Amino acid sequence: MQLTGSQVIIECLKEQGVDTVFGYPGGAILNVYDELYKHPEIKHVLTSHEQGASHAADGYARSTGKVGVCMATSGPGATNLVTGIATAYMDSIPMVAITCNVGVSLLGKDSFQEIDIAGITTPITKYSFIVKDVTKLADTIRRAFSIARKGRPGPVLVDITKDVTANKVDYVKQEPVFTQPDCSAFTEEDLDKALHMIEKAKKPYIFVGGGAILSGASETLKAFVEKVDAPVCDTLMGKGAYDGTSANYTGMLGMHGTKTSNLGVSECDLLIAIGVRFSDRVFGNPKKFAKQAKILQIDIDPVEINKNIIVNHSIIGDVAIVLGKLNEKLEQQKHTEWLSHIADYQKMYPMTIPKEGLSGPFMIAKIYEMAKDAIMVTEVGQHQMWAAQYFKYSKPRTLLTSGGLGTMGYGLGAAIGAQTANPDKQVINIAGDGCFRMNMNELATASRQKLPLIEVIVNNHVLGMVRQWQTLFYKQHYSATVLDDGVDYVKIAEAMGAAARRVTTQEEFNAAFQEALESKTPFVIDAIVDSDDKVWPMVAPGAPINECFDGKDFESKNK
């Protein structure tokens, strides 16, 4: 049957099982929005800004594992998606961004709102398409979804000229193609070599990243950990891949990782890296990282092998499949003495919570106590690290955070996406006051959609993480980090249709958070904390991770 390009776009979205689109209309994409109006089976969430739409699509994808979809018009509409696309790219999140451009006859003529968005996004997508021929439209959209899902996931952009959305073409419905993970990159010899390394190790440590979540490998990973009988640490992106309440779990590795994980990895004789990219935030000084260990790396992307850290052996493949193969062959290991040594570290270096005063660690721990099944979302900064340190993530896809790009302003849009996709779950966004300012306009979106998400602002009136570095490494030169300008976040929240409370004590926070849990609309808690609160432990930039220090260490050193 013959359909217009706009109709083809909607039919292709339906083919792919898309039930929600986040976006903002405009002239070039108006034909598509007119067609979308006729299809209530696809929910459209109108955000307050296109960046919010891209973050919402990201949050939808992270919390479900499905492809998130966002749309924007030409020119500034398209460029406003860029930060969200880059955020998804850095964290390997499947997303399809659909933009519309000026007509073919107007391309290259500096036309109104013309922009080469495909060119702009080429470095931050798995692929960027521009469609100038309606006969190629359907297959391009199908390819976009396939590319976004296949192998290491990521965002794909499809830019469509306006005339293509109006032209007619024959359309034949197709079922979506879901390709199975490719196992051809590794051999039995690869598995056998890995098994030999594991069986020979006396002090193995398992290091888990976001790739384990993207692969859906949590159950296979659990069985692998039990067979290897080893302690487990993770990255920020790997939170929830392995049960954070397990006795084997020692917390995050790296700059703000636990002392146990940092010291343990520095002492281990085998580091099994699963779905990690060895970020600079993890290894500290690469020349001194895990120097006593042989390293076995398992990852679906060959580009990650030996990119930042040289490894002794690698297996390239889907994490769940590789671990499953290893589990079939691996005999039960026993490392009682090693695990006891690591347990001693955990007793020596616990993650402590200030007993008095309102603080980030206290609030995160209380949130865990009152809402341990929530989907946690964060912005970027000190509060992000506290959310990683003090909430025990027992399931995958329950911490949504910008790890690679470190995008301030990510959280509220992502929370909207997650809450839209998971209406029966509690979604909580942890923000700093600096981050909240970035995209607080999306609170109006949450109110309009009647989303019962909770926004906790850890309000220290400064850019906390930057101030921490200025305190520790820049002689307390607080350049451009003070935000004490009287902005009333409670009034802003109420003006946007949300309930809001300001709290200054532990008791006030407990009461406000209970009220927030019972709310049917967005609820903002403006929590006032000390400007000089710091994230501990910490590894200084460029230092080896075994030189991690906490507040007491820092005070002793600088007496």
Where are these regions (language model features)?
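N-terminal alpha/beta PP-like core and its mobile active-site loop of ThDP/TPP-dependent enzymes
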Residues: 1-330, 366, 452-457, 473-475, ...
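Active-site diphosphate/adenylate-binding microenvironment
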Residues: 6-10, 14, 18-19, 32-36, ...
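Active-site nucleophile and cofactor-binding loops and adjacent substrate-binding regions
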Residues: 24-26, 45-55, 70-77, 132-133, ...
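Glycine-rich phosphate/pyrophosphate-binding beta-alpha loops
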Residues: 26-29, 75, 92, 155, ...
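Thiamine diphosphate
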Residues: 107, 112-113, 305-308, 314-316, ...
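Phosphate/pyrophosphate-binding active-site segments
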Residues: 135, 173, 196, 292-380, ...
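Basic phosphate/pyrophosphate-binding loop/patch that engages nucleotide-derived ligands
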Residues: 150, 371-372, 447-452
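Generic enzyme active-site microenvironment
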Residues: 157, 297, 377, 430-431
